[in-house]
């Protein structure tokens, strides 16, 4: 099986063309391939498939390193767009795709950045899903013997965002896994730790569902900005500084889609016997 290794700000992917290859990935095989000592090593596996709708260009599936399938991955979307152009599967700059979450339009810019229409953030608890009696801008949670204030939102996948004074000293490794599997998140959640530098700039670390802390999380950056705007902390255009680099997020508020712009890097091509 041929594959490519790619990354978006250090969030790394094994990308497989299932348009021209017949492939099947069991959870066990994905876990083996994801192992950084015994396999290829990656945060997520991206599988490119033919479209199910003639109006679309592709369908793609996203699997975490633990073998679980997820509906959305912002960094993966950008790598997907670069991959299909690099491999000659399309020469379009505006690429229409479907995922388990719905449809997206990805735009490759003249400077080889990728702009992704991530859709409108959904703050309804049932959409996240999150156990709450009603939608609030801020929720109070108990975890690890602490009282935590957070915002929750769906960006096609579940996110919890906590504001911290300094991301460098935030309890990502201890609080992240506790909140990820908290009983109020029946499908688990991605946990973002956000430091507001100013209204147009935040720093962010994300403990990803099924992957742990990663160098960058595109949907996590979108979630942090959406929650920050909802809570009146941020402007409509925000620079997000992650351990792996920078993303630019823009959202005009309710009734409008959120846009993410950032890089996608092709590292190498490989071949593996399954």
From Swiss-Prot:
Its EC number is 5.1.1.7. GO terms for biological process: lysine biosynthetic process via diaminopimelate. Gene3D superfamilies: Diaminopimelate Epimerase, Chain A, domain 1 (3.10.310.10). The record marks 159, 208 as: Could be important to modulate the pK values of the two catalytic cysteine residues. InterPro entries: DAP_epimerase_AS (IPR018510), DAP_epimerase_DapF (IPR001653). One of its GO terms (molecular function) is diaminopimelate epimerase activity. Keywords: Amino-acid biosynthesis, Cytoplasm, Isomerase, Lysine biosynthesis. SUPFAM superfamilies: Diaminopimelate epimerase-like. Pathway: Amino-acid biosynthesis; L-lysine biosynthesis via DAP pathway; DL-2,6-diaminopimelate from LL-2,6-diaminopimelate: step 1/1. Substrate binds at residues 11, 44, 64, 74-75, 157, 190, 208-209, 218-219. NCBIfam families: DapF. This is Diaminopimelate epimerase. It comes from Shigella boydii serotype 18 (strain CDC 3083-94 / BS512). The gene is dapF.
